[in-house]
From Swiss-Prot:
GO cellular component, one term: membrane
Enzyme type, top EC level: oxidoreductase
EC number: 1.-.-.-
Keywords, sorted A to Z: Glycoprotein, Membrane, Oxidoreductase, Transmembrane, Transmembrane helix
Lineage start: Eukaryota, Fungi, Dikarya, Ascomycota, Pezizomycotina
Glycosylated residue positions: 95
Cellular localization per UniProt: Membrane
Pfam families: UstYa
Motif (HXXHC 2): 176-180
Metabolic or biological pathway, per its Swiss-Prot or TrEMBL entry: Mycotoxin biosynthesis
Membrane topology value: Single-pass membrane protein
Entry protein name: Hydroxylase cctR
């Protein structure tokens, strides 16, 4: 006769002991996952703070490098355009008469403007003389036209020297010429045009390449709208000029190593 087996009796755990067991064994199984979650959370928080600090430092550095001086005269906004630079144009043509006519037609005083005194102060423009015929307006010369003036002075001196003209120059003229060289150098360094110019080992470099430029027509329009009506011949209050005399430069035959191409 088969012997009946009695089920084994499991010991009854005290509720407190059951809780202790769960605490010991159950929590030990969950602990790795909890630690991973905590680690990942701390890692995300750390990265967020780090990237935030880097962004703040970068922004602060950019703002510091672009800090505008309080005495910076805010210039009028002039549109940007792309133009080709040519090695030889009408302004450097081998036709000397054409060269002279073009250069002598330039009216640098077209860049003399008159604007409202109060408005100029709002743009941080420096104090200046008043327009004789209208004391409410302040007189300024646009930088680009000052450079045009200096180029004219230097070219006139070069032409006279090449022609063997006998002339004696005053100390003021010497100082003016030195100033123009200096001014053009400062302007060139200020613009720091980094356009890479092609070269094949000859004299000519970069002819026909595109450059990023300010729109001269837009600058001329601004000068027209705010003209001080100043000319070298009649001074202020004279007849306003019909323009600055500049014409668009177009490519012409080019001289390479002593030969016209």
């Amino acid at each position: 006769m088969e012997e009946e087996l009695e089920p084994l009796n499991r010991p009854t755990l005290d509720p407190d002991e059951s809780y202790a067991e769960e605490k010991i064994y159950g929590s030990s199984h969950r602990e790795p996952n909890s630690r991973i979650r905590v680690f990942v959370s701390l890692l995300i928080l750390s990265n967020t703070i780090s990237f935030g600090l880097l962004g703040w430092i970068g922004l602060s550095s950019t703002q510091a490098s672009l800090a505008i001086p309080e005495d910076y005269a805010i210039p009028p906004r002039i549109a940007t355009q792309y133009k080709r630079f040519w090695w030889t144009t009408e302004y450097s043509s081998k036709n000397q008469s054409q060269q002279d006519e073009l250069w002598n037609s330039i009216v640098w005083t077209y860049g003399m403007i008159g604007v409202d005194h109060e408005w100029s102060k709002s743009q941080h423009w420096p104090d200046t003389m008043s327009l004789p015929q209208d004391k409410t307006k302040a007189v300024y010369l646009l930088q680009a036209y000052h450079e045009i003036h200096c180029l004219g002075v230097l070219r006139r001196l070069m032409s006279q020297s090449l022609a063997g003209v006998d002339f004696s120059e005053s100390e003021h003229t010497h100082a003016h010429i030195a100033h123009c060289f200096d001014s053009l150098l400062q302007s060139t360094i200020c613009r720091a045009d980094s356009t890479p110019l092609y070269t094949f080992g000859g004299t000519i470099v970069g002819s026909g390449q595109q450059h990023e430029c300010r729109d001269w027509n837009a600058l001329r329009d601004y000068a027209t709208q705010n003209s001080a009506c100043y000319t070298e011949e009649s001074g202020f209050g004279g007849q306003c000029s019909d323009g600055d005399g500049l014409v668009p430069a177009t490519p012409m035959e080019t001289q390479q190593d002593g030969f016209w191409l």
